[in-house]
Structure formats: C-alpha cells, structure tokens
Amino acid sequence: MDFPENLPSDIGRLEQIVSHFFPKALHIVLNSRIPSLQSRGRTRERLSGLNVRKSDKWFNLVMGDRPAALEKLHSWHRNILDSMIIDIILVHPISNDNLDDDDDHSDSVVRSAETVIERWVVQYENPLIMSPQSSDSATRYQKVYKKSIILLRSLYAQTRLLPAYRVSRQLSSSLASSGYDLIYKVSSFSDIFSGPVTETMKEFRFAPVEVPPGRLCASVTYRSDLSDFNLGAHITLPPRIITDYVGSPATDPMRFFPSPGRSVEGHSFTGRAGRPPLTGSSAERPHSWTSGFHRPPAQFATPNQSFSPAQSHQLSPGLHDFHWSRTDAFGDNHQLSPPFSPSGSPSTPRYISGGNSPRINVRPGTAPVTIPSSATLNRYVSSNFSEPGRNPLPPFSPKSTRRSPSSQDSLPGIALYRSSRSGESPSGLMNQYPTQKLSKDSKYDSGRFSGVLSSSDSPRFAFSRSPSRLSSQDDLDDPDCSCPFDFDDVDESGLQYSHSLDRRKTSSSISQSLPLGRRSSQDAAVGVLVHMLKTAPPLRQDSSTYMASMSGVQREGSVSGTESEFSMARSTSDALEELRNYKQLKDLLLSKSKSGSGPTRVH
C-alpha cells in the first residue's frame, strides 16, 4: 500500500494508519454478524477487484463497499484516542412464564428481550510518558502497517470461530421469521456487565501493535454457550440431508431422475480424432453420479460398435476426457465422469475387437464386461515402448511372473522382453507391426497381464512400473537371495535392469539365456560362479552318501509324484545291481588268485 507523500511527518502517517484501522475493524465485525449486511460486498466485482474504492484497499483486505450505516458510523469517529466499542445484541423472544400475572398483554403478543452476546473493543492506548524515538523513523510506519495487516487478519479469523457467527449464518438462511435477530450498537463507552453475566462471558485479547508513541489494541468478550436461547427449536433451516439421493435404500430402484433439457448419459471417455462417441445403445451404463442411474439397462454392444486395435492404441490408459454438461460436435451431452471406478458396478467397459474374445453373461443392472484372452492381447502389443501413450498394455514385468508355479517359466519371458526392447523378435524378424502375434506361450502372460483385469471383473489399466528399474516392493517379495552381488544387466540400448537370483535352479537358466560376456557385469559373473560352486555335487561318493542325499532331497520335496518315486527306485535298484556285480567280480578274482597261487612243483 502506497502512503501519501504530502504528510508533514512520520507521525502523520502513523495517525493515518490508525484512522483507517478503526473503520476496517468495524466493517469486519458487522459483516460477519449482521445478517442484513452480509449480502453486501459479496459480488463478483469485489472478487475481481473492479469498482473498488481506494480506501477499501487498505491493509490488503477488500471487504466491499460499505453500507450506508457504516458510512454514517465512519463520520462520528474523529479522534483516534477514543475507544470504539461494538456490541452484538441478540434479540430473542421470551416465554409467557416470565410475564407478570397482572400484565395486560394477551397471549397473542410476543415480547422480546435483548442480550449482549459479544463486545468488541478497539482502542489506541496513548501512554502519558513519551518514549524516545528511534533512529529508523523513516521505515517505522511500514513496519506498523505490516503488523496492522496481521492484526486485522487475526480479527477476521476470530470472528468466524465464535458461537455468534453460527447464529448469524442460521438467521441469514432461515426460511421463516423466528423472532430472533442480531443487531449492533457502536459507541465510545458502554455499560459494565453485571456479576452473573460476567461469569458466562469469556475474553480474548489480540496481540497489540506498537504504534509510537502508543499501541493499537483489540479484544473481544463473548458468551461461549448460547444454548439457553434455544435457537435450534425456533429457527427453521433448509434441510441438509437428501433423503431420496441416488442409491438410497429408501429410494425406488427404478425411479427416474429427470434432468433439465436433454437427456444426459455418463461416459468414461469420449471419442477422438473424428470418431463418434458411444451412443446410448452401446454397452454402457450411466454412473451413479449421473442423472440416469436408474434407467433400464441398455442393450449390449454389438461387434461393430467396439473399438478397433488402432483406436485402442490412440487412447492412452491414463488420459480421459472430462466433460461437465457439455455438448460435443456429434450432439451428445456428457457429464463429468472419473476415468477409474472404485468398484465394478459403475464402470464403463472397454472393448478390444476380436472374434475370439470370450464374454461373460451378466444380469440386468450390471455393467457388461469383456475379458480378452492372452492371444488377443498379444496381437495388439506394440514394440514402441518409448511411447507409453501408444501402448495399451503395461510393460513387461519379469519379476511379477515369478509368482507363477514354476520359476523357470518366467525366464523366457525376460528374454522375450529384452529382445523386444532391442527391436528383435524371437523369430529373428523386426517387430515393427502392432498386429504381429508374438510366439510366446500363454503361461508367460500370467504375470504380465496380472494388472489389466481387476478382481471386480472391471477392465482397467493399472499404473505400470518403470521398465528400467524394478520397484522396491518387488524386491521385498524375494527376501532369500543366494547371490552376494547385485545382478545388473546393461543391454545395448543403455537400460539398466536389476534382478535377484533364486535359491534353486535359477543360475543355470540365466547363464543360458543371458550370456555373461555380453550382458553381465564382472561382479555378476563372480556371483554366478560362487553360486555354482556352492551348489555343485561332490566328485566322488559312496552308496551310503548317495542314499542319504537322495533321502534328503525327498524330504525337501523337490521330487514329487509317481514319476519321481519311480525314478528314485530305479536308481536304487541299479546301485544294488552294480554292488552285486562288484561282489561277484571280487569273488571271481579271489577264486582265481587262490587257484593260481597253489603248491608249485620243484624241478
């Protein structure tokens, strides 16, 4: 705020701040307490800063044009040393029990009483002893002005926290005359509260602002409890609870909620690039927050109304159009609709065209859902992973495939993912066409497409992780790591990929699918070597050690089923057969040695 430069001294500027502080504080209190004054100054022009007087811009708090009553009150205050006392008075009716028996008033006449529920005091305290002036008098008024802004903002906030503010709001929104009203009285002096009234009042003092040679003070004395006046029983307020809201158990399920103008239909997303959006006959159902929730269910979608692969690629999973009662170029009216739904009930299905897509028969009132098969989803996989907006599916997640029953089945998926990232298809051809079907077994898709369909049978796209680095949550899924080094893979495209080895049978498969000389770092190669040395069987073992090791393997459960027991029985019988042959050979050698070492003849 720029102050006038024609003031004679710094004292004149300080007096100007105080003189503007009093009417601003009065305007704040009356605007929050008197219902007849609350409607004034609430126009759009006040919010936009248009048609605002220069005096209203003081203290960076625009309250709007002052009413005529405030203009009259502004003229009475000429001396800043006089206190300004604002009494907020509640006018309330009194019962006939309080009337005297000899009163001439009839029962039809209602008497009212006035009770002071708040008293605001704003004053400038000028000490009798003048304090010495500091040397920085040139910037003193700027500090006082900034502190005055803080004091007025505190005053503005405190007016909204006291009980009288709630009464003022109730009276301003009352539907009928209740006999209650709030009035005010402004004066330089007031009567002192009596003893019983003082016990029901509380006082709050604001931090004063030092304005040399005195200080600017503000305080409020208020009634903390207004339940004695029984305001709730006499004030008729508009209902705040909607009893016939959409989805209420008390509402008829087939009730039609009309909307003004044309019919409104809810969509999760609309068409783009000249494609018309789905009409009312398509496979969709209005959401619960639209006006047509209880309409009869529409017919299911036909194959010619489903999205094509090209349309699926052009629609990004995370981008949806939000419309608020807006009519598009095709004449359809749409409302605001979030892209994701918390449950499967209000979600609009998303279709991928294909003749072999299985459908689920649903009862009326449930959104139709199409679950795409793995072969259909593989057909529309795009190799351009650098553009996530064109890829309708999340990127490959090698770690998520480890949740499958076999840990080795996920390794070809990792190799396929890396080959697709480098632009090579498994068959040696360039994977440039999105309609090319990847030659990959369907069991590899169990981890990759785990986030596409939710448990509520509502197709949606989950937020995919970064393909270059797995999240820390996946690292916690595998606490057992037998390799002491991090397995960091750096492919030709410069992407880093971290992967931890399994305890059993994983190092050999990784060494086959990922050559160490090309993709593995030196630390990873040492880790694989240490793992191989730890898990390598001994070079020589006897039959007892072999039997003990086979029994230990059987206890661990690595061999299961009839086939494994049959192979173990064959190995035991073969060992016994070899032992029997060794015994026969030993007996034969001993018999020959005895026959050869008989008594020799002496010639």
Curated annotation (Swiss-Prot):
Organism field: Arabidopsis thaliana
Region of interest (Disordered), ranges: 258-477, 498-518
Gene3D superfamilies: HORMA domain
Record's keyword annotation contains Protein transport: yes
Transport as UniProt keyword: yes
UniProt record, GO biological process: autophagosome assembly; autophagy; protein transport
Protein name per UniProt: Autophagy-related protein 13a
Protein modification: Phosphorylated during nutrient starvation. Dephosphorylated in nutrient-rich conditions.
Main location (coarse class): cytoplasm
Phenotype reported upon loss of the gene: No visible phenotype under normal growth conditions. The double mutant plants atg13a-1 and atg13b-2, or atg13a-2 and atg13b-2 are hypersensitive to nitrogen or carbon starvation and show early senescence.
Compositional bias segments (type: Basic and acidic residues): 320-331
Xref: PANTHER family: AUTOPHAGY-RELATED PROTEIN 13, PTHR13430
In-chain residues carrying the UniProt-annotated modification Phosphoserine: 248
